[in-house]
C-alpha cells in the first residue's frame, strides 16, 4: 500500500488557455511533468459559480463539465500544482484528497 493523492480539476469543455482547449493543455502538462496517469471525464450536466452547464440537442455548441483526475504520490502532485494554477486561474476548481494505492505498476 502506498499513500498517494487524488488530484481532480473541474473545468468546462470549452475553456481555453492560449488558444488551446484547457483540458488538453493540462493533460500535456501532467504527462510532461511525469504524473503517473490521468483521465478526462465529460459530464452530462453540472453547475457551479459560473452557472449551469447541460447538454442541449438543439444547440450546436455545448460547454459541458470536464473533470481531469490523476493519482500520484504527494511529491509529484505538489510539484505540478504551480503550473496548473498558472493555467487554470479563475476558470476551474482543483481538489486534492488523500488515498491509498494498493496496486499499481508505477508504484511497485
Swiss-Prot record:
InterPro entries: N-reg_PII-like_a/b, N-reg_PII/ATP_PRibTrfase_C, UPF0166. Pfam families: DUF190 (PF02641). SUPFAM superfamilies: GlnB-like. Belongs to the UPF0166 family. PANTHER family: UPF0166 PROTEIN TM_0021 (PTHR35983:SF1). This is UPF0166 protein MJ1524. It comes from Methanocaldococcus jannaschii (strain ATCC 43067 / DSM 2661 / JAL-1 / JCM 10045 / NBRC 100440) (Methanococcus jannaschii).
Amino acid at each position: 500500500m502506498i499513500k498517494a493523492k487524488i488530484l481532480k480539476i473541474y473545468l468546462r469543455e470549452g475553456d481555453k488557455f492560449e488558444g488551446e482547449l484547457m483540458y488538453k493543455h493540462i493533460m500535456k502538462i501532467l504527462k510532461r511533468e511525469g504524473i503517473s496517469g490521468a483521465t478526462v471525464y465529460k459530464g452530462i450536466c453540472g453547475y457551479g459559480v459560473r452557472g449551469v452547464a447541460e447538454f442541449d440537442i438543439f444547440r450546436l455548441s455545448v460547454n459541458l463539465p470536464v473533470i481531469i483526475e490523476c493519482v500520484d504520490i504527494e511529491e509529484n502532485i505538489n510539484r505540478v500544482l504551480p503550473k496548473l494554477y498558472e493555467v487554470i486561474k479563475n476558470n476551474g476548481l482543483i481538489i486534492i484528497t488523500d488515498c491509498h494505492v494498493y496496486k499499481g505498476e508505477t508504484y511497485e
